[in-house]
Regions:
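Substrate-binding clefts and catalytic carboxylate motifs of secreted carbohydrate-active enzymes
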Residues: 29, 83-246
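Alpha-helix N-cap/helix-initiation motif
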Residues: 1-2, 167
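Active-site mouth loops of central-metabolism enzymes
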Residues: 2-3, 173
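Alpha-helix capping and helix-loop boundary segments enriched in small/acidic/polar residues
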Residues: 3-7, 37-41, 213
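Alpha-helical scaffolding segments of alpha/beta enzyme cores, especially the outer helices
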Residues: 11-15, 44-52, 180, 221-228
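Alpha-helical scaffold elements lining the catalytic groove of polysaccharide deacetylases
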Residues: 4-18
């Protein structure tokens, strides 16, 4: 923000501090997401925010950005066994993998005619032929869809899957990913002491997303896979790679 008028920024900062500081659910202030708060211009903006928080709301923690020193955002979609290799990271602040959500809830927001040919959702024409489906697909990016379907193909045939088939397969594939991820991170204790999967719950109806609970409040299989890793006594299989191929 080198060219941003800092007096305007400071007025906006103060307005939002006064607006939000009495909210009991507010636990921490954060300057932003996945940007460099120390670069020219950004450092001045973060300094103004930090100074005003120290004056007007000094009881809450302030983080310049996420991730910052000691934390990491990571999306190694291919193999969750990689997480065990992050043994020097104190806190994994954001990570996860896509899956299709509950079919019954999807049918409430997407026309039946669009719930076909889902195996080709990374094709160029998919957006034109499935506008409602794509509209409710959180962070739709054709380059990432094959990774989700590749993982699901280990569970079932993804050539021309029915909605129920692709939902079950992607959720189980993602659930396996979350389980191995959590086990790997927990095994790095006491260096790694925190894991925050992205995201716990979507606030609106979605057909596919990185989430544990969909917008209708329905937990995906990923929720239960992850929850199981926090049982009092949990046994894990320590493998170098989840997938092996000749």
């Amino acid at each position: 923000t080198p060219e941003w008028p800092q007096e305007v920024w400071e007025a906006q900062v103060c307005q939002n501090i006064f607006r939000l500081r009495n909210q009991p659910s507010l636990a921490v202030w954060c300057g932003g997401n996945e940007f460099n708060p120390y670069s020219y211009g950004n450092a001045a903006s973060m300094g103004i925010l930090e100074r005003n928080l120290a004056i007007f709301d000094p009881t809450r923690c302030f983080l310049r950005t996420s991730p910052d020193a000691g934390s990491m955002h990571s999306y190694p979609d291919f193999d969750p066994a990689w997480y065990k290799g992050f043994e020097l990271i104190p806190y994994v602040a954001e990570t996860g993998v896509h899956c299709i959500t509950d079919p019954a809830n999807i049918k409430q927001v997407v026309s039946p005619g669009e719930l076909v040919d889902l195996g080709g959702m990374y094709d160029k024409n998919f957006v034109l032929e499935h506008p409602e489906f794509v509209e409710h697909f959180a962070e739709y990016n054709p380059s990432r869809v094959p990774r989700m379907l590749s993982r699901a193909s280990h569970i079932d045939n993804m050539a021309k899957p029915a909605l129920e088939t692709i939902a079950e397969a992607t959720q189980i594939g993602a659930g396996e990913f979350y389980q191995v991820m959590s086990e790997g991170v927990q095994s790095n204790y006491p260096v790694t002491t925190g894991l925050m999967p992205w995201v716990y719950k979507r606030p609106w109806p979605v057909v596919a997303a990185i989430n544990l609970v969909d917008g209708m409040g329905q937990p995906s299989a990923t929720y239960y896979f992850l929850k199981r890793t926090y049982e009092p006594t949990h046994v894990l299989l320590d493998i170098k790679r989840l997938l092996w191929a000749p």
